[in-house]
Amino acid sequence: MKFSIADKSIKQTKDILLILGIFYKDCYQKTLKYISDENKKNIIQVVKNIKIKDNIGSTYFISNTNKVGSNPILLIMLGSKVNINSRIYKKLIINTISSIKNIKYKKSIFFLLNLNFNNSNLYWKIRRSIEYIYESLYEFNNFKSKTKSYKIYMKEIMFYIHDENEIKQANIAISHSVSISKGIIITKNLGNMPSNFCDPHYLSHQSYILKDKYSEKISVEIMDHKKIKNIGMNAYLHVSKGSSKNPYLSIIKYNENKFNGKSPIILIGKGLTFDSGGISIKPSNNMDEMKFDMCGAAAVLGVMHAISELNLNLYVIGILACCENMVDSSSYKPGDIIKTLSGKTVEVINTDAEGRLVLCDVITYVKRFNPRIVIDIATLTGACVIALGHHYTGLISNCDELSENILNASNITEDLAWRLPLNKKFSKQLKSRFADISNISDRSGSAITAGCFLYEFAKEYKWAHLDIAGTAWKSGVYKQATGRPVSLLTQLLINYGDKKI
């Protein structure tokens, strides 16, 4: 799907579908002033026979009358409220796309930008529209032998901008939303793949696809089991001991040559392509969803795609920490003590608290890059789901400024996050009788204590931890990866790159 700005003269072309919203009573007159008299007549004639007061989101198609100034029209019923929220706007977009699938026109002009929702400016109206459109069109049927596929005839949606002074802002919105949406699709596709296809080797080596596409901006290094061992990342290796699949660490550098010697922003993604829990095995119920335990790494890859396409003026390193946590005679065990890359020792109380063991070594490893900021993204704790549900990503940080920047990006993108406390009182729960620290505490505040564990290895950085256990995928009938928090993180980097809107 292509998105562009409509030339004012193009709306008279009869082969172009007009998409516009109609309010109850006289409110629709404002929308109609931008279209031809013939189209106004056609709409008014149809609206007289429609009860639209409480029928928000319903669509009506008006075919072309072949008269001069006549277009095919898709009417979207907006009800009686002039101000709508983003939830209703999303419903309007979804219903619009559903209707477009059955209409055989290749181009359309989109007039819904005149709506007032959440006091959004033009940039956010366009960005929300495109992101909702991509979400509506997304399907993952890669492994079905037979699918009910559909053909969408629409190839281009043009946004009608009546103020020429806003065209530059509109084009920026298109660029941002398309790039972010493509990054989200990459993240979703990887998350939705089964672990017998998307194993540590497959996931880590997806970074080469990015390198091939953006060879001037991207460099990639992939460490295998031997390199990881030689560096001394013992905690990382212990997690993978029970799997026949070797671990890999993929390091993706964006704009390294341009910012030679400068400090990068570092994103670390947990990439457990399957997590059985190890010896502390998980319950069988919903264990299939543990293929989603790599969504942190998938999100980092999606963000790196998005910023490469946007050509942000930043130095960013994305790291995919890929391995499996399986049950075997060689698996690491409760009671084991592991010396991490930092030199600290960890007593393993529960092998299902494996993500923090992988991440602690990677957080230590990135010290060599002298990072400006370090953010880790992980499906880390079920406790975060209990605390924040499936709406908010958990945020823990040692830096108020970084937290505020993340929360600002989360609020404006509606990819929501909520800050949890970082406090020594929680850290005391991680004390070990036999090692420097335990890998898990008691159940109280365990989403926070998981963050406190990671902080033990991140004290030298401006650091933030995003726990996406509740937001990375949906369960039940609509089970699939969500692509979060690609939108949040890309917006954060857009803001850091001085392209803030």
From Swiss-Prot:
Matching InterPro entries: Leucine_aapep/pepB, Macro_dom-like, Peptidase_M17_C, Peptidase_M17_leu_NH2_pept, Peptidase_M17_N
Cellular component terms, GO, for this chain's entry?
cytoplasm
Q: Which residues cross the membrane?
A: none
Query: Which residues are involved in binding Mn(2+) 1?
Result: D275, D352, E354
State the needed cofactors, names only: Mn(2+)
Presence of the UniProt keyword Protease in the record: yes
Location comes to:
Cytoplasm
Q: Which reaction does it catalyse?
A: Release of an N-terminal amino acid, Xaa-|-Yaa-, in which Xaa is preferably Leu, but may be other amino acids including Pro although not Arg or Lys, and Yaa may be Pro. Amino acid amides and methyl esters are also readily hydrolyzed, but rates on arylamides are exceedingly low; Release of an N-terminal amino acid, preferentially leucine, but not glutamic or aspartic acids
Q: What class of enzyme is it?
A: hydrolase
Q: Where does Mn(2+) 2 bind?
A: K270, D275, D293, E354
Whether Metal-binding counts among this entry's keywords is yes
The note on the cofactor says:
Binds 2 manganese ions per subunit.
Tell me which residues this entry annotates as catalytic.
K282, R356
Q: Could you state a single Gene Ontology molecular function term? A: metalloaminopeptidase activity
Q: Which UniProt keywords apply?
A: Aminopeptidase, Cytoplasm, Hydrolase, Manganese, Metal-binding, Protease
Q: Which domain of life is it from?
A: Bacteria
Biological process annotations from GO:
proteolysis
Extract the SUPFAM superfamilies matched here.
Answer: Macro domain-like (SSF52949), Zn-dependent exopeptidases (SSF53187)
State which Enzyme Commission number(s) the record gives.
3.4.11.1, 3.4.11.10
What family does this belong to? Belongs to the peptidase M17 family.
Q: What does this chain do?
A: Presumably involved in the processing and regular turnover of intracellular proteins. Catalyzes the removal of unsubstituted N-terminal amino acids from various peptides.
| Protein name, entry field | Probable cytosol aminopeptidase
| Organism per entry | Wigglesworthia glossinidia brevipalpis
Lineage summary: Bacteria, Pseudomonadati, Pseudomonadota, Gammaproteobacteria, Enterobacterales
Gene giving rise to this polypeptide: pepA
